[in-house]
């Protein structure tokens, strides 16, 4: 059976389908619907404070008794100078003026927020913890394992996958370059961050690690799930497929933009957050490409552009806000999450029937 393997057993799920923990875009209804449909729903906790995360976990538990996960951002070493911030603020001033915004005060609370997230996950006995942007330190991994929490890391290269396994992850998401949103890269090669496609990345990781591999990037339906399994993955993680669901927290602006876009419309940019992320190209990205200075690293740039993005989204201006999307938007739907899950499963079963 395609849906019975080490991953489904480890995560206590019926189908090896994980809804990506998209920070700012998941809702308790989305998470619970995926879990109730036999997959693993995941709370995107990246931007939550402690109380918000506790409330989200409690709400999900009211809606499902099945397994679910929480995705957290691993803090990275920030490299920035005051002149970088000053220069970026000067560049962003016309956007703020047009939207009647003040210059923000940058607060770096990443490390503290991450520690609180880990404490909350342990306190609330969340079944699964997923990591993006790196690997937590040994003591955090030990604490989570002592609490019997399953750990899923993210890799965009073979070296990152090996590092995840050595650190003690129970499974690895192999994030191909087709994936929407932020790249999960954390080992920086000499030239640039890895941009390896899913079909190339998955089998190369499968061949060098002994733990289950979860394919991610461009997977939207049953065909993508089965293709991933053929490549050696034991499951898939899907983001954009659930982002456009009516159960997600995506704005109508973003939902419509994805549904009406095509595979050539996305680019990978640091313009909005200081980390490479794939989204639909727009005026802000185009104009930021002309910026001659160094874009401050995440989370600095994310803080500097936050009010601009929110204000633009509030007035329906898709040219000045981030529109994260993977490279398969033509396959996106606005169905409820449980319908998306049942359609995927039915399509897989139909394909298997004819093979």
Curated annotation (Swiss-Prot):
UniProt remark on cofactor binding: Binds 1 FMN per subunit.
Assigned protein family: Belongs to the nitronate monooxygenase family. NMO class I subfamily.
Other facts: P3N is a potent irreversible inhibitor of the key enzyme succinate dehydrogenase in the Krebs cycle and electron transport chain. P3N has been shown to be a toxic metabolite to bacteria, plants, fungi, mammals or any organism that uses succinate dehydrogenase.
Record's protein name: Probable nitronate monooxygenase
EC supergroup of this enzyme: oxidoreductase
PANTHER family: NITRONATE MONOOXYGENASE-RELATED
Its job: Nitronate monooxygenase that uses molecular oxygen to catalyze the oxidative denitrification of alkyl nitronates. Acts on propionate 3-nitronate (P3N), the presumed physiological substrate. Probably functions in the detoxification of P3N, a metabolic poison produced by plants and fungi as a defense mechanism.
Nucleotide-binding is among the record's keywords: yes
Binding site for FMN: 71, 175, 180, 218, 237-240
Keywords: Detoxification, Flavoprotein, FMN, Monooxygenase, Nucleotide-binding, Oxidoreductase
A biological process term (GO) from this entry: response to toxic substance
Presence of the UniProt keyword Ligase in the record: no
GO molecular function annotations of the record: nitronate monooxygenase activity; nucleotide binding
Cofactor(s) needed by this chain: FMN
Catalytic activity line of the entry: 3 propionate 3-nitronate + 3 O2 + H2O = 3 3-oxopropanoate + 2 nitrate + nitrite + H2O2 + 3 H(+)
E.C. number(s) listed in UniProt: 1.13.12.-
Pfam family, one: NMO
InterPro entries named among the record's database cross-references: Aldolase_TIM, NMO
UniProt-listed SUPFAM superfamilies: Inosine monophosphate dehydrogenase (IMPDH)
């Amino acid at each position: 059976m395609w849906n019975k393997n080490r991953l489904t057993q480890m995560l206590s799920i019926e189908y090896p389908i994980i809804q990506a923990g998209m920070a700012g875009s998941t809702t308790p209804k989305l998470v619970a619907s995926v879990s109730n449909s036999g997959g693993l729903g995941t709370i995107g906790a990246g931007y939550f404070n402690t109380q918000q995360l506790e409330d989200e976990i409690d709400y999900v538990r009211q809606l499902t008794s099945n397994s679910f996960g929480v995705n957290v951002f691993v803090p990275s070493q920030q490299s920035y100078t005051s002149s970088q911030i000053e220069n970026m603020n000067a560049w962003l001033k016309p956007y703020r003026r047009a939207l009647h915004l003040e210059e923000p005060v940058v607060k770096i609370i990443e490390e503290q927020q991450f520690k609180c997230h880990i404490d909350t996950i342990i306190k609330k006995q969340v079944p699964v913890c997923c990591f993006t942007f790196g690997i937590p330190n040994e003591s955090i991994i030990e604490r989570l394992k002592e609490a019997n929490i399953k750990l899923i890391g993210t890799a965009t290269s073979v070296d990152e996958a090996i590092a995840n396994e050595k650190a003690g992850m129970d499974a690895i998401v192999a994030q191909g370059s087709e994936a929407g949103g932020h790249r999960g890269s954390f080992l920086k090669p000499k030239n640039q961050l890895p941009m390896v496609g899913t079909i190339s990345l998955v089998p190369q990781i499968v061949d060098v690690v002994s733990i289950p591999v979860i394919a991610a990037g461009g997977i939207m339906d049953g065909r993508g799930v089965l293709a991933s399994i053929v490549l050696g993955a034991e499951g898939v993680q899907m983001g954009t497929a659930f982002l456009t669901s009516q159960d997600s927290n995506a704005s109508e602006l973003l939902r419509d933009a994805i549904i009406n876009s095509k595979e050539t419309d996305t680019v990978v940019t640091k313009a909005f957050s200081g980390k490479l992320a794939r989204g639909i190209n727009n005026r802000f990205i185009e104009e930021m490409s002309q910026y001659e200075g160094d874009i401050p690293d995440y989370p600095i740039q994310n803080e500097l552009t936050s009010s601009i993005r929110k204000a633009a989204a509030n007035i329906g201006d898709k040219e000045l806000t981030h529109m994260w999307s993977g490279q398969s938007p033509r396959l996106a739907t606005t169905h409820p999450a449980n319908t998306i899950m049942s359609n995927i499963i039915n399509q897989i079963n139909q394909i298997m029937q004819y093979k």
